[in-house]
Regions:
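Short hydrophobic/aromatic beta-strand immediately N-terminal to the Walker A/P-loop
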Residues: 42-43
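Cytosolic-facing regulatory segments adjacent to core modules
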Residues: 31, 62-149, 163
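Conserved lysine of the Walker
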Residues: 52
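Pre-Walker A segment
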Residues: 1-38
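Conserved small/polar residues in nucleotide/adenosyl-binding loops
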Residues: 182-189
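Hydrophobic positions on the alpha1 helix immediately C-terminal to the Walker A/P-loop
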Residues: 55
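P-loop (Walker A) phosphate-binding loop of NTP-binding proteins
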Residues: 47
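Helical hairpin unit composed of two closely spaced alpha helices linked by a short loop
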Residues: 150-181
């Protein structure tokens, strides 16, 4: 344990302030966190409709498409189709409204096809199982890890996840239990 910690400190000192984890694409965030580190549990919280999903999709896009990392997104609020459409818009730089209406220029189609190729070649997995439990999530993550590799897991969003079913006293306690379970989520190496 001590030698492992010293080894990580030595590697960090040799990197001279560069990102030691998986970069997010947000320079200031990467500077503060040095990227997302293995086994980190990072919770993105804000009031409703503040852009949490858009923010984590930007991170997922950067990690999966620019850094070729294996990313699993578990979406309990939006469908897989909705997320893919948002990713199409992000990656192709085509306005989301144009994608929804189909009112696109020829140059938009070219960018969309190029973006679709990037998305299709990535190691991105989107799972939109409603009300998934922590045990189901753990099982799926292990399966994905064995089949594709897995560098990061994104869950959107925590409050819609079902607990262990042990009949906790309150929803607040159930959410707390789910959060603790995330910190113990381990994947085979």
């Amino acid at each position: 344990m001590v030698l492992n910690a010293l080894d990580k400190i030595e590697k960090a000192s040799k990197s001279k302030g560069t990102v030691t984890g998986i970069p997010t694409g947000f320079i200031d965030l990467d500077y503060k966190l040095s990227g997302f580190q293995p086994s980190d549990f990072i919770l993105i919280a804000a009031r409703p409709s503040m852009g949490k999903t858009a923010f984590v999709l930007n991170i997922a896009q950067y990690m999966a498409f620019k850094k070729n990392k294996a990313v699993a997104i578990f979406s309990l609020e939006m469908s897989k189709e909705q997320l893919v459409n948002r990713l199409f818009s992000l990656e192709s730089q085509v306005d989301a409204q144009s994608l929804r209406t189909g009112n696109m220029k020829d140059s938009d189609w070219e960018k969309l096809i190029e973006g679709a190729g990037v998305i299709g070649q990535s190691k991105l997995i989107i799972d939109d199982t409603p009300g998934i439990s922590i045990s189901e999530l753990r099982s799926k993550c292990r399966k994905y890890k064995l089949e594709h590799g897995l560098d990061i897991i994104i869950i959107d969003y925590l409050q819609l996840m079902s607990g262990s079913g042990r009949g906790s006293d309150s929803r607040q306690q159930e959410i707390s239990d789910i959060s603790v379970s995330y910190t113990h989520l381990t994947l085979p190496t």
